A protein has these predicted regions:
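Short linear sequence signals and composition-biased patches located at protein termini or domain-edge surfaces
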Residues: 138-203
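Aliphatic-rich helix starts adjacent to a transmembrane/signal segment
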Residues: 4-63
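Generic macromolecular interface patches on structured domains
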Residues: 37, 68-69, 175
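Short, well-structured beta-strand/strand-turn elements
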Residues: 63-75
Length: 203
């Protein structure tokens, strides 16, 4: 007579299923956390690169610009010069033959719906022909700006002697990540100073 082998009991099957499901859940949690950490790192790195590009562009525009603003009412007053502002304005192009000039303004604005806040850095370019406005372009330069300050040091004239840009940016798309991990998104702060090229040539 053949002896029957004893199979798993219902309790043993339930225990095995519980162990298996626990291992699968732990694996999925680890994969999910790894994906969120990867997303967090790439978003922060991307924002850092973009912020540096914007900073380099701002410094280049200041270096080649002319007739900067805002400027203090009294250049010799220590409480007015240097001047700190949330916007910067200057002439980026001028043609004496056609009387054409382009005025660029970089300013901080409250973020609109759909933009990462609290602020967005905008660049506005206005074209004048014989002092008549002929064209205007307005576009965002950088989102996720938490603060931006332009510190302008003037000489008698007033001529801009030195401009310091202090830019603080929050890495993009980190809110969703922070809900699932304990990662906190560090802000990116870039500070740099530049002198207009015309001033350097004069010196």
């Amino acid at each position: 007579m053949t002896k029957l082998r004893r199979g798993f009991s219902l309790v043993e099957m339930l225990i095995a299923l519980t162990i298996t499901s626990t291992l699968l859940a732990a694996t999925m949690t680890a994969l999910h956390a790894s994906f969120r950490a990867y997303k967090f790192t790439t978003d922060a790195a991307s924002t850092h690169v973009v912020s540096r590009i914007v900073m380099h562009r701002l410094l280049t525009m200041v270096r080649t610009g002319d007739q900067f603003g805002p400027y203090p009412a009294d250049v010799l007053a220590a409480n007015q010069n240097p001047l700190t502002s949330t916007y910067l304005e200057f002439i980026s192009y001028y043609d004496a033959n056609t009387l054409t000039k382009k005025v660029v303004r970089v300013e901080r604005r409250d973020a609109k719906s759909g933009e990462q806040g609290p602020y967005t850095l905008y660049i506005i370019e206005k074209t004048y022909v014989n002092e008549t406005l002929t064209a205007t372009t307005d576009q965002p330069l950088l989102q996720g700006v938490t603060d931006v300050k332009f510190t302008l040091e003037y000489d008698i004239g007033p001529r801009l002697r030195r401009a310091t840009v202090d830019l603080t940016v929050q890495p993009a798309d980190t809110k969703d990540t922070s809900l699932h991990t304990e990662l906190s998104a560090p802000t990116i702060r870039l500070v740099s100073s530049v002198m207009p090229r015309r001033l350097e040539l004069e010196q």
